[in-house]
């Protein structure tokens, strides 16, 4: 049976055929680079950053320890938390698999953990606070050692999301992905502000006869890492395939109840027609690639929303594969489509991505036990350009602006990303003719699928509505694909 977990002990896989993404391909004019910043980790499985102003990263190790890294002091020798006495590591895929600091970690010090329980191998969600470990929710998982899932993360709604695999073996022997009476093969949504947990009243299966109300999304095989885009609250999910396709799914914040298809489908292909429900609506993946041809197990990543590379990489979702360690870049387009490309290679055996409090990306790798910081470099030729920013109207606390970008060079621009910074706390609320994102004061406008090319001497125009306070100073400095415009 094909190894299906991202954390299995493997030597580096043999060279594979050239990457041919099954999703829409596009050039990103972008290369990923990494810098090793720490070593000595023991099979790291997850990365999370507390929102406490400390600049720290928490890193889970499979055996049950949570380590602390700081960019100034490095990797601390003593663990922050050690729950190894509670954690089963039998089988390659069991262990401490997920960590999530409370959104109020600075005041409550609560750290949420997902692991396999040593007494019976049940997948377990627990809270560690004040030195006490409290179990919140478990799901029986003793029959097979693989497909535990384990990712946990808080959404922008303040609720905790937990991904659980289908129960293991191969072919979904319990038909868990398509059943609503089990937590296997699902992503859950929980309110953990209660003593243990409560079910949010707006969960999609609340009140559905026979359904577990904790469920938020169904049809998953082994979700090995999901993450939220802080810009819009959407959820990116990487689901490890059976033997044909690895997939990445992208759900809007309002798509609770989505069925991602397993085990009726594997990626976009029918896996077992007898498990396809009549009248069911399955959500297609936004990216797939061939298992055993281009890799072995997808490793889900994160969307870049940092400031250091905002002008060239804002909105890019970065993922990889355990065996072949490519850097897959995927971007959501304004029209609902997605573009993808391979933009380099990452360190061998990547197991998890995470971001620091500033949105900068890190990754860990399995047996090498290293922490790496990710950076981006533009490969696009520096454009000659001018920008005209026009304030068309303003009222009370709002305004309407238009931006005209002109290519003053002698070569065409074949994909553009224009960046600027607001000085007075302005916020973009709605835009058109460009994909506009904002992180703090930094704004990035990227081309739509139909206006990516700007010929020499040509212009492209986009506009937006925004909110403001008393002052509304127009920006004067713009960068196009990393180069300054006049």
What name fits each language-model region?
Residues 40-55, 88-108, 143-160, 215-232, ...:
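Beta-rich, blade/repeat-based domains predominating
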């Amino acid at each position: 049976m094909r190894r299906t977990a991202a954390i299995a002990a493997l030597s580096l896989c043999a060279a594979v055929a050239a990457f041919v993404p099954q999703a829409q391909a596009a050039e990103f004019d972008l290369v990923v680079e990494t810098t090793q910043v720490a070593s000595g980790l023991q099979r790291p499985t997850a990365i999370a950053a507390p929102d406490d102003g400390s600049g720290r990263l928490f890193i889970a190790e499979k055996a049950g320890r949570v380590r602390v890294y700081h960019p100034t002091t490095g990797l601390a020798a003593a663990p922050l938390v050690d729950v190894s006495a509670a954690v089963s590591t039998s089988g390659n895929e069991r262990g401490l698999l997920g960590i999530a600091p409370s959104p109020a970690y600075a005041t409550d010090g609560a750290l949420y953990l997902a692991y396999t329980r040593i007494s019976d191998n049940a997948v377990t969600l627990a809270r560690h606070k004040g030195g006490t470990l409290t179990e919140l929710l478990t799901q029986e998982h003793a029959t097979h050692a693989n497909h535990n899932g384990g990712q946990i993360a808080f959404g922008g709604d303040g609720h905790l999301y937990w991904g659980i695999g289908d129960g293991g073996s191969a072919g979904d022997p319990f038909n868990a992905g398509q059943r609503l009476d089990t937590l296997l093969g699902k992503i859950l949504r929980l309110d953990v502000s209660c003593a243990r947990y409560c079910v949010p009243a707006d969960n999609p299966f609340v009140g559905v006869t026979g359904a577990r109300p904790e469920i938020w999304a169904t049809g998953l095989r082994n979700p090995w890492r999901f993450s939220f885009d802080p810009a819009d609250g959407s959820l990116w999910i990487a689901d490890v395939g059976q033997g044909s396709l690895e997939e990445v799914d992208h759900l809007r914040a309002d798509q609770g109840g989505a069925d991602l298809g397993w085990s009726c489908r594997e990626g976009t292909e029918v896996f077992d027609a007898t498990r396809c429900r009549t009248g069911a609506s399955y959500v297609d993946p936004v990216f797939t690639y061939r298992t055993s041809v281009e890799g072995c197990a997808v490793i889900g990543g994160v969307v870049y929303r940092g400031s250091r590379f905002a002008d060239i990489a804002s909105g890019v979702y970065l993922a990889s594969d355990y065996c072949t360690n490519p850097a897959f870049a995927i971007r959501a387009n304004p029209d609902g489509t997605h573009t993808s490309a391979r933009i380099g290679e990452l360190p061998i055996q990547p197991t998890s991505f995470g971001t620091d409090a500033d949105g900068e990306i890190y990754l860990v790798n399995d047996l090498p036990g290293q922490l790496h910081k990710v950076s981006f470099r533009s490969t696009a030729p520096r454009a000659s350009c001018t920008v005209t920013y026009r304030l068309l109207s303003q009222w009370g606390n709002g305004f309407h602006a238009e931006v005209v970008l002109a290519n003053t060079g002698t070569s065409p621009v074949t994909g553009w990303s224009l960046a600027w910074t607001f000085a007075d706390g302005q916020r973009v609320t709605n835009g058109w003719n460009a994909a506009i994102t904002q992180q703090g004061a930094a704004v990035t406008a990227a081309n739509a699928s139909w206006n990516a090319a700007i010929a020499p001497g040509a212009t492209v125009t986009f506009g937006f509505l925004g909110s403001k306070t008393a002052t509304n100073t127009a920006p004067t400095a713009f960068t196009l694909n990393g180069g300054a415009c006049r």
